[in-house]
Amino acid sequence: MNRQKNNLIFQYSAVVIFFLIVMFGLSLFLAGHYTPGGGFVGGLLLSSALVIITVAFDIKTMRKIFPWDFKILIGIGLLFCLATPMASWFYNKNFFTHTPFEIPLGILPPMEMHTATFFDLGVMCAVVGTVMTIILSIGENE
């Protein structure tokens, strides 16, 4: 993909749209265990935000903004997906037994989380890594 020229409106709107999609994807990720959403949908939204940045600018610019290798992100995601259900074994519980816990937020009411959130985080990392690896490998071959 070559850098597009004279697309100032598209490039500036892509940056705004990027942040909107990332915020919506993170809210779907955090609400995912109790409502529709979760790691897969959040990962698809995050990778679509990265694809918008890639299309608006180019692959070289996207790699400058996000310098990590997305294949490593797949491995990190799979590690989370494997470690989360196995962690229940250390507490003498059945495989994939999840436990709720609360995160204190100071003056705000505590945020209720679930250990399944870490599994969803692994799914999200694996989805973002897979989608971006496929998109970037297709784009770099042109």
From Swiss-Prot:
Keyword flag Transmembrane helix: yes
Mode of membrane association: Multi-pass membrane protein
BP terms from Gene Ontology: proton transmembrane transport; sodium ion transport
Transmembrane segments: 12-32, 37-57, 70-90, 118-138
Compartment(s) of residence: Cell membrane
Covalent S-S links between cysteines: none
One GO cellular component term noted in the UniProt record for this chain: plasma membrane
NCBIfam families: 2a6301s02, PRK12573.1
Quaternary assembly: May form a heterooligomeric complex that consists of seven subunits: mnhA1, mnhB1, mnhC1, mnhD1, mnhE1, mnhF1 and mnhG1.
Name the record gives this protein: Na(+)/H(+) antiporter subunit B1
Organism of provenance: Staphylococcus saprophyticus subsp. saprophyticus (strain ATCC 15305 / DSM 20229 / NCIMB 8711 / NCTC 7292 / S-41)
Lineage: Bacteria, Bacillati, Bacillota, Bacilli, Bacillales
